[in-house]
Design a protein with these regions (language model features):
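Active-site hotspot residues in diverse enzymes, especially metal/ion-binding acidic/histidine motifs
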Residues: 1-153
Length: 153
């Protein structure tokens, strides 16, 4: 399967999670989705430089740590959504966490690893699902309030 198709399917899987969870409105809260799946999410201590998020595994229990040293809610939400991608996408857990341990994701660079690219595309589909965004952007008169609503979503 081509990488382009894998990325498209990852984005669609992010959107499908919203349907499965019956979440139909913006803003999407990745912290809530994690909680619904008994995934503990916490801010990461500032000890691992350049790490934006981590997926942790102990047996069948999972946790997510996200970078708190970057005080940007959108960045933090994307980091959590990215780690959820590793959790929800087929084959990711076995690839990034074949045994108990920690998988660290790094921000600020474009990874050549298709699993990281898929997790990014999953996060896009989860946080910016096409239908609600099209509906928001389809209004006849867009103004500052609409732009701010899209930003906050």
């Amino acid at each position: 399967m081509s990488l382009l198709l894998r990325l498209r399917l990852a984005k669609q899987r992010g959107e499908a999670i919203l349907s499965e969870e019956k979440l139909t409105k913006l803003a999407v809260d990745p912290f809530e989705i994690a909680a619904r799946h008994d995934i503990i999410v916490q801010a990461k201590p500032d000890t691992a430089s350049g790490v934006s998020g981590m997926l942790l595994r102990h047996g069948n229990s999972f946790g997510i740590l996200y970078a708190s040293d970057i005080p940007n809610e959108g960045f933090q939400r994307f980091s959590v959504a990215h780690e959820l991608g590793h959790y929800f996408l087929d084959g990711h857990i076995d690839h990034v966490l074949p045994n108990d341990g920690v998988h660290a994701s790094h921000a600020g660079f474009s990874s050549g690893d298709p699993y990281e690219q898929e997790a990014d595309n999953f996060a896009v589909g989860l946080l910016m699902p096409a239908k609600p965004f099209r509906k928001l952007m389809g209004r006849s008169r867009l103004g500052l309030e609409d732009i701010e609503a899209a930003r906050d979503a």
